[in-house]
Amino acid sequence: METTVKIKKSVLKRQKIAAAKEAAAKGAVKAHLNNVPTSTRKMRLVADLVRGQRVTLALGILKYQAKQGARKLEKLVLGSVADWQAKNSEARVEDADLYIREIFVDGGRVLKRLRTAPQGRAYRVRKRSNHITIVIDSLKELPAAPVAVVEEKEVVATAAAKPKATAKKATGEKSKAKTKAN
């Protein structure tokens, strides 16, 4: 008899974040966009369109998408490409064949507002937001960046080389001098 283990949402989220951090360490680039004022459900529809796509194709899809979240996601993809270029300065973006390796949308903070209702009541309006995390990577292996070796020189400091601090007058001497003058 096989038993299934139910994993909490918080544990799944922690695992997802750990996997994204691990991917970023290997050469992939991770970018965040926090507190986007769109509901999580609407943004996930747009994120599902570009998940696993090449970056050039994803940008084309997002550019002509009529949904509101597409503009924000397009800027995030462009920003992550710029981050990838900064991290891998020796490689060209066109030759790297970048793709969206991972993209997920988590719920952000919910602003609660009141809307007037009949008979003196008020309805609660929830203004939802979300957090987007995207990981882009290259399909091709990139050459390793050259490692610079820095030689360390041993510096011996002598006590005579250090200048000695001059002694400061005590604050009590100044106050005594002022009282004598008065």
From Swiss-Prot:
GO terms for biological process: translation. InterPro entries: Ribosomal_uL22, Ribosomal_uL22_bac/chlpt-type, Ribosomal_uL22_bac/org-type, Ribosomal_uL22_sf. One of its GO terms (cellular component) is cytosolic large ribosomal subunit. Pfam families: Ribosomal_L22 (PF00237). GO terms for molecular function: rRNA binding; structural constituent of ribosome. Belongs to the universal ribosomal protein uL22 family. Part of the 50S ribosomal subunit. This is Large ribosomal subunit protein uL22.
